[in-house]
Structures are given as structure tokens and as C-alpha cells.
Amino acid sequence: MEPEILSIELIKPSSPTPRHLKTHKLCFLDQYRNHAYFPMVFFYSVTHDTNLNLSNETDIAQIVSVRLQLLKQSLPETLSLFYPFAGKIKDNLSIDCSDEGIYFTEARFKSPLKEFFNQQNFSCLTYKFVPFDAKELEGSISGLHVAKIQVTSFACGGIVICACLSHLFADGATLCSFLKCWVATACKNNEQRISPNNDASWLFPQNEAYPKEGTWLAMCPRFFGHGRFVTRRFVFDAKAIATIKAKASSSTRVQNPTPTRVEAVSALFSKCVMAAFKAKHGSHKTTLLTHSVNLRNKAKSILSEYSMGNIVWNANALCTNEEAELDLEGLVCKLREAMMKINGDFVKSLLGDEGFLNLCQAIKDENGVCSKAKERINFSSWCNFGLYDIDFGWGKPMWVSVIGLDGKLPYFSSTIILLDTRFGDGIEAWVYLLEEDMNTLELDKELLALATLDPCPLW
């Protein structure tokens, strides 16, 4: 199954961006990031239109056409608020907001959506919905689009929307804010329209003295492998998460004995992936557990929920050789201790005249921790983002995903992305590992007793 590309166009904001906003300066938190598109993928069924004959191809084509037009017609007004999304990357420090337009692709599969889910390892095939390829991660970034969207229709009338954003510009929370604004615009719900906040550019002003060795890629290149990275999706229901929580809070060792579902699942994967690393090396190697922390939640009096940019920082927990046999409770302790350090005081330390110096110290500290580790596991949680509320008027998505990367990228790092399940009480874990490590992880009895590997999201 391969999609047919029907059209590619640039959709411009409904009103021109003011002259003084034509250049969007990245903040120094953005300077830590490298360019890479990260996608959010939304799968929608056709079944909410009960007044149409779904056995009639003409009616199905009409449904798709109406929905597609709604998406396209509501984008310009959304882009007038989120104007950098219609821009291009100028260099490592700025976005050219000359309103060239957001990159918008229409594609089509001639088969019904259920056939996509009937394929073996269908989660690994979600890359077919993205409007970019691996070549855009190489070479010059100048002139690349900040954001891209692809809408793919199926013969049954189902639609898949993939929205991608450059990590050089902003994080997942920013993309989620854009999507919520797009939904409110499409549904003519002005009360729910989000106005983004550009406070990060002056709270954390960019600095040309930012160390070149202080970017995500440059700091620890040995953690970015050039082998074959593969993707697997592990799904935990509410019962499984309750079991993990119970195992991770079986004594009074933890001050707050009940871990969150994100802490519990992160601890489980830390244990299981480190066991896979041990099987490869023959012994435990010091491993760095890195969890992205949303700074907006840590300093609500300073930052808006809708602040644009990479308003995140890494919480790092080092598991040394002496800590090779930590149980789930011990791993929850380590992760929580690391994440608690990324707090309101940390955000305040980045403000004012000393802010950049304190950032440089934080980079130096992370570099020091990285130098002690032989392996690294990166965690990013998109739970509680409200992604299943992205409803353009024809119903909530039946599935929200990221993408599979089996052999598709020139380099990558061991990464686990956590998402809500459709009903909000479970977690989907998208795991990206070198194939050798994944082969071991897929045999982990403790993990398989708790998670289901790549279940179909249709039921």
C-alpha cells in the first residue's frame, strides 16, 4: 500500500504578518535543539455522518471533499495567529515569517482504512502519512518549512491528518496548541481559539555566544547510532498500569509512594531496556535516563500554557554499575528525584542578566553526566496533551500516533514516547531502539506480561 500524492500547495495566513514580526527570533532554549520534524498523526473514521449512504462512492467522495475544504479554509485564520508555522527556517537563530505559507499535501489510498490496520506491524508503516523524508535531516536547514501538514484520505472516507513541526522552532506542546486553535477555528468556536504567547523570545533571549557543543546532537554524539533503528508499540491498559504502580510502591521507601502512570511506565522501560543493553554488552553499563520536562507547568506565574518554543529541559538520572539491579521502586525514585530538580526555581534561574550563564552551567552539568554514561534512554511524555480532543466537527480521532522509523533515518537515539490511549486511562509507548536491542526487549517476560504488542486500535 502506497499513497498517491494528489496535490501540494502553500496555504498562507489570512492576514499579513506585521513588519516588526517578519523575523521570529529563537530563544536560547531553542538553541539547544537541532532541526528534525516531529509528527502527530490523527486517524478519523467516516461513520459520524449517518445521514449519508456510505455504500455510495459518490457520497463518500463528497464527505472527504467537504472535510478537506473545511481543513483548508480554516487554516489561514489559524496561521494568522501562529504565523511562524507559515514561515521558513532562516538559520539556527531565526524564522523568516514572510507568509510564504504552510506546506500542505493531499494524498489518497485507494483501499479502505481497515486494510492499513490489517497489515503486519502496521505501526511501523505510519511513516507513509508524513510529508517529509529523511533527506531533510541532512544538509543545510536554511529554507526548510517550519511546519508541514498532510491529509490522506481512504476509499472508505476515513481521513488521516499528519501535522509536523521543526524541533528547532518549538516542542510538542506548541504543536498541540496550534492544533487546538485550528479545531476551534474550523468549528467557529471563538471562545476556544488559542492565542499563542511569544514571551519566550524575550524571557530567554538568544545569545550568539551559545556554545556550539551545547546542542542536543553535539553534546553526546555517541548516543546517536548509525545502525538500523526499529520501532515497536507497546500498549498498557488501566489494569496493567495499576499493577506496575503497585510493584513500584510496595514499601515506604518512596516519600510519595504512589507513582504516576508516566513514572511507572518509564521505570518499567528503564528496567527492561537496561536489561537488553546488558544482554548485548555482557554486563551492565552506566545508563543515563533522560526525561523531557515541560517548563510551562513548573512556572505558571512566568510562562503561559501557550508559550511558543522549546519550553522544555532534560531531567537526567544516572544508573551506575552499582545500581544495575534497581527494582521498579528504586527507578521511580531516581526518575522522580531528577524531575523534581527541574522546578520553578530552575526556570527563575534562567531569567534576567544571569539567565544565559545559568543555562550554560546547566549544559555543562548535562555534558558532565553524559560523559559518565555508556548508554542513554530518552523519554518524552505526550500524555495529558488532550490529543483525542482534536475534533474538527466530525468526531474525535479513533487513534493518535507518532510514526514508525524502521530503517528510515540515517541516525537516531534510543527513545521512548508515551501517549494516552483513546479512553485516557492507559498508555501507548512507542519504543525506538537498535534492532539488536529491540529483538531482546521483545522477549522480556515482565514487559510482555503487562503490555500488548501493537494491538489494532479499532477495537
Curated annotation (Swiss-Prot):
Its EC number is 2.1.1.-. Belongs to the plant acyltransferase family. GO terms for molecular function: acyltransferase activity; oxidoreductase activity. This is Limonoid 7-O-acetyltransferse. The keyword Acyltransferase applies. The lineage of its organism: Eukaryota, Viridiplantae, Streptophyta, Embryophyta, Tracheophyta. The keyword Transferase applies. It catalyses: (1S)-1-acetoxy-luvungin A + acetyl-CoA = (1S)-1,7-diacetoxy-luvungin A + CoA. Gene3D superfamilies: Chloramphenicol acetyltransferase-like domain. Acetyltransferase involved in the biosynthesis of limonoids triterpene natural products such as limonin, a compound with insecticidal activity responsible for the bitter taste in citrus. Catalyzes the formation of (1S)-1,7-diacetoxy-luvungin A from (1S)-1-acetoxy-luvungin A. Monomer. The active site is at H167 (proton acceptor), D391 (proton acceptor). Expressed in maturing fruits and in juice vesicles. Pathway: Secondary metabolite biosynthesis; terpenoid biosynthesis. Disulfide bonds: none annotated. The gene is L7AT.
